[in-house]
Swiss-Prot record:
A single cellular component GO annotation: chloroplast
Organism: Isodon japonicus
Keywords of the record: Chloroplast, Isomerase, Magnesium, Metal-binding, Plastid, Transit peptide
Protein name: Copalyl diphosphate synthase 2, chloroplastic
Function: Involved in the biosynthesis of ent-kaurene diterpenoids natural products such as oridonin, miltiradiene, eriocalyxin B and nezukol, known to exhibit antitumor, anti-inflammatory and antibacterial activities. Catalyzes the conversion of (2E,6E,10E)-geranylgeranyl diphosphate (GGPP) to (+)-copalyl diphosphate ((+)-CPP).
Length: 800
């Protein structure tokens, strides 16, 4: 792990800082934007042959020309030019890359409590001095003005356990009498607050370690502490009651959470305890527990662990170390949900390789080399590793399944917290065929969370995050299949608090790689830049709608907006303008054709049949269609629009697109034009326009490609029928159509898993099929009112 002082990380707490954070941009109010986009007299026609460079240029000006008054007061100077906007993004990306690539053992804030226990270790050479004097110095330098020690976020449990421990450490070496006095006064004046403390925010092992600290304080003769206070006596009683329920020999048999608080357990058989020591020398990654073990055993592995933790944490000790697994997994999760992971693909690959290397058959814990695993880190690991193509066995979750069918964060859990079960739910949604443990996990997690929400009993003891409950509610309403990337990001901006999140362990702590304001600042700037470009593309789409007389085919502008939204919410990157435009146009033109062929008009049935056949079998000869057909207004408009759609590309791409449309026409003629063929056409079009096919048309006949095409066709045809009939049935967070669910799982498996034998098709090609399928599922799952809200959030709502 790099020094905690690197990258401007302060040592108390170790949280990332930037002298000039990226500006938060604000777009004009929605009413202005909406009116501007929908009133043709508000702007000059752009012409439907607009190109990517033109859009990008106008977008840069849009982002950069914001008034200074629109920029938050605390985020530095206003961004006024395209160069400044791009520079802000580039600086933030560079900063985050450096942060991630120097993560090492993971960054975590120093814990006063653990630092105090380590400070008690006497010099190994027998001198009357601490072995780790830097810990004593850290304590002396980090007392708060009110006499307490702890996180700036006030919680009486955190302040009491930290302050008691710091007072004991200072008194043990008879230094800083003034600080001891202030600390004692704080405890005496505030201990009564424990009676009304928020039980959900009680620090881990509080009732186990407090009596042990108090006994040490008594032995040191510290005067003035409220030893006889009723609340203190109650804590002693609670500890006795809890420990009486645990068989004495259990602690020696296998790793349990008791190893995290050895300093609070009293007499132990240390020979047996040492057999449960982790490979890095720690006891469940706890510096305080390991320090106590060293004081009892003088074990050299314990010492090496403590020495390493103190050296890498600015002279203090965190509440847990290392946090390499925890930091990496949650950092990836945050970057993905904020919509900025594309900037950090090499770093994410590096992180996931590390997680894969330390993975065990029972999962993982917050730090590597731990015999103990928990469902939180394991669930997050399963989801992210599977999502990125790693071959991971979800049966690790069986380790957390109890005899009654319930899942628990770890054995012996007294109160089940919400966030680990929510992460279990997230992992369980990424299910491949035959993964029964994930089916069981889905049902349990969904019902557990729904019941807790319904009864207003959501309890969270691992993190203090203001909007966690809202995040969970949304996650249950919007499962992974029905979530589009930019919709997820738009909502996550509301929930992600950056450095405002506080984590709960033995003490409160901060995680810069997880909770980082620069992440959000970069995400907001990027979202606004993308949104501005999407708005200009929407202007262009409206011009195309008018010039192509799309309305005459019974297609409303709102339907056009939905088609464009699905594209923009899925492939949102600024450089993918061409793909977004083709996505929306392909959906609309295919509907125009079906509308023309199905509605009564001036053409006879025989003429329409002739036109239909010529479309399907002689696309290259569109100009040769007889004059009778061209003379019909709608037929002429349709032919012109269709021809323009194909001719916007080079000859070879146009040739490939014509082939894709020919296949679609054949299926339409065979009566398969009810969604499935549309999805297949869309996936083929996107892969062609993105250059994935290029001069290698053999890909189109590859076994994986044809299987994906077939699955996408079949699933999306069924989803279209469901959408039309509005009969999507959901139970326990899963659709009741088991056949379709199994097909969806097969598609996801084929897309995400890397081919074991090699020779598979490019991952980006496969991802296109998943993206298209998810938009069909999205439309079948969500009501129109919900979709309207999402359209507003993604395309028009300013993000600040």
């Amino acid at each position: 792990m790099t020094s905690m002082s690197s990258l401007n990380l302060s040592n108390a707490p170790a949280v990332c800082r930037r002298s000039l954070p990226p500006a938060k941009l604000r777009l004009p109010e929605f009413s202005t934007v909406y009116g501007w986009l929908n009133c043709s007299n508000k702007h000059e026609p752009l012409g439907y042959q607009i190109r990517r460079k033109q859009i990008s240029k106008v977008t840069e000006c849009r982002v950069a020309s914001l008034e200074a008054s629109q920029v938050g007061e605390k985020v530095g100077p206003a961004v006024r030019t395209p160069e400044e906007a791009n520079k802000k993004i580039e600086e933030s990306i560079a900063y985050v890359k450096e942060l991630l690539m120097t993560s090492g053992d993971g960054r975590i804030s120093v814990a006063p409590y653990d630092t105090s226990i380590v400070a008690l270790i006497k010099d190994k050479e027998g001198r009357d001095a601490p072995e780790f004097p830097s810990c004593l110095e850290w304590i002396a330098e980090n007392q708060m003005s009110d006499g307490s020690w702890g996180d700036e976020f006030f919680c009486i449990y955190d302040r009491v356990v930290n302050t008691l421990a710091c007072v004991v450490a200072l008194k043990s070496w008879n230094v800083h009498a003034d600080k001891i006095e202030k600390g004692v006064s704080y405890i005496k004046e505030n201990v009564h607050k424990l009676k009304d403390g928020n039980i959900e925010h009680m620090t881990s092992g509080f009732e186990i370690v407090i009596p042990a600290i108090i006994e040490r304080a008594k032995a040191l003769g510290i005067q003035g502490l409220p030893y006889g206070d009723p609340i203190i006596k109650e804590i002693y009683t609670t500890k006795g009651r809890r420990l009486s329920k645990i068989p004495k020999d259990m602690i020696y048999k296998l790793p349990t959470t008791l190893l995290f608080s050895l300093e609070g357990l009293g007499d132990l058989d240390w020979e047996k305890i040492l057999k449960l020591q982790s490979g890095d020398g720690s006891f469940l990654t706890s510096p305080s527990s390991t320090a106590f073990a060293f004081m009892q055993t003088k074990d050299e592995k314990c010492y090496k662990f403590i020495e390493n933790a103190v050296r890498n944490c600015n002279g203090g000790a965190p509440h847990t170390y290392p946090v390499d697994v925890f930091a990496r997994l949650w950092a990836i999760d945050r970057l993905q949900r904020l919509g900025i992971s594309r900037f950090f693909q090499p770093e994410i690959k590096y992180f996931l390789d590390h997680i894969n290397n330390v993975w065990t058959e029972n999962g993982v814990f917050s730090g590597r080399d731990s015999q103990f695993c928990d469902i939180d880190d394991t669930s997050m690991g399963i989801r992210l590793l599977k999502m990125h193509g790693y071959n991971i066995d979800p049966n690790a979750l069986k380790h957390f399944k109890q005899e009654d069918g319930k899942f628990s964060c770890y054995g012996g859990q007294m109160i089940e917290s919400a966030s680990p079960i929510y992460n279990l739910y997230g992992a369980a949604q990424l299910r491949f065929p035959g993964e029964e443990i994930l089916e069981e996990a889905t049902k349990f997690a969904y019902n557990f969370l729904q019941e807790k929400i319904a009864n207003n009993q959501i309890q969270e003891k691992w993190v203090i995050s203001e909007h966690l409950i809202d995040e969970i509610k949304l996650g249950l309403k919007m499962p992974w299949y029905a979530t589009l990337p930019r919709v997820e990001a738009a909502y996550y901006f509301q929930y992600y608090a950056g450095t405002g999140d506080v984590w709960i362990g033995k003490t409160f702590y901060r995680m810069p790689e997880i909770s980082n304001d620069t992440y959000k600042e970069l995400a907001v700037l990027d979202f606004n830049r993308c949104q501005a470009q999407h708005q200009f593309e929407w202007i262009y789409m409206q011009e195309w709608y008018q010039s192509s007389n799309v309305k005459a085919f019974g297609i409303s502008k709102k339907e056009l907006l939905l088609a464009y939204f699905l594209a923009a919410a899925t492939i949102f990157e600024p450089e993918r303008t061409q793909e977004r435009i083709m996505w929306a146009k392909t959906q609309i033109v295919s509907r125009m054709i079906k509308s023309f062929l199905s509605e009564e008009n001036t053409l006879s049935l025989e003429q329409k049949t002739t036109l239909f056949v010529e479309f399907g079998h002689d696309i290259n000869g569109l100009n040769k269609i007889n004059s009778v057909e061209k003379g019909n207004g709608l037929a002429g408009t349709l032919l012109t629009t269709f021809q323009q759609l194909l001719e916007e590309f080079d000859r070879y791409t146009t040739h490939q697109l014509k082939n894709a449309w020919s296949q679609w026409f054949v299926k339409l003629q065979q009566g398969e034009g009810d969604g499935g063929a549309d999805a297949e056409l869309l996936a083929n079009t996107l892969n062609i326009c993105a250059g994935h096919i290029a001069f290698n048309e053999d890909i189109l006949s590859h076994r994986d490609y044809t299987t994906l095409s077939s699955l996408t066709n079949k699933i999306c045809r069924r989803l279209t029928q469901i959408q039309d009939k509005k009969i999507l049935e959901i139970k326990d967070g899963s659709i009741k159509d088991k056949e379709m669910e199994e097909e969806m799982q097969a598609l996801v498996k084929l897309v995400l898993e890397e081919s074991e034998s090699g020779g598979g098709i490019d991952r980006n090609i496969k991802q296109t099929f998943l993206s298209v399928f998810k938009t069909f599922y999205y439309c079948a799952y969500h009501h129109a009112e919900t979709t309207d809200v999402h359209i507003f959030k993604v395309l028009f709502e300013p993000v600040v």
